[in-house]
Amino acid sequence: MYRAVTRNIEVQVRPFYLEDRSDPSENRYVWGYQITIDNQSDEFVQLLSRYWHITDGAGRVEEVRGPGVVGDQPELNPGDSYQYTSGCPLSTPSGIMVGHYTMRNKRGETFDIAIPAFSLDLPGTRRTVN
């Protein structure tokens, strides 16, 4: 489990390899990741957008930006949590992801919260990125 806390909002990530969607003979490796966002602050927040910086085992970088997560822009009151699962394909057996969410509070202020860096490593292989 990987975790980061920004402004009392905790982001936890649990990555896992999706063997049934991967095909190493075709250089296709697919990971899922489960994210939990826990609003431990004393203010309402809404997740507006996401940013990912994805680096594969060969050092190739892909940046992904978009509104919300999995088609949702969740609203979290103090004490609320939100969980979702998504995925990431790579052409190498290892990689690393890191990023942030842009949030908005009731006053209309926007700010970024960190998504912790986490490894994507094929089970049983040597790590090459991290």
Curated annotation (Swiss-Prot):
Pfam families the record matches: DUF525 (PF04379)
SUPFAM superfamilies named among the record's database cross-references: ApaG-like
InterPro entries per the UniProt record, alphabetical: ApaG_domain, ApaG_sf, Uncharacterised_ApaG
Example of a GO biological process term: error-free translesion synthesis
Segments forming domain ApaG: 3-127
Record-linked PANTHER family: F-BOX ONLY PROTEIN 3, POLYMERASE DELTA-INTERACTING PROTEIN 2
This protein's name: Protein ApaG
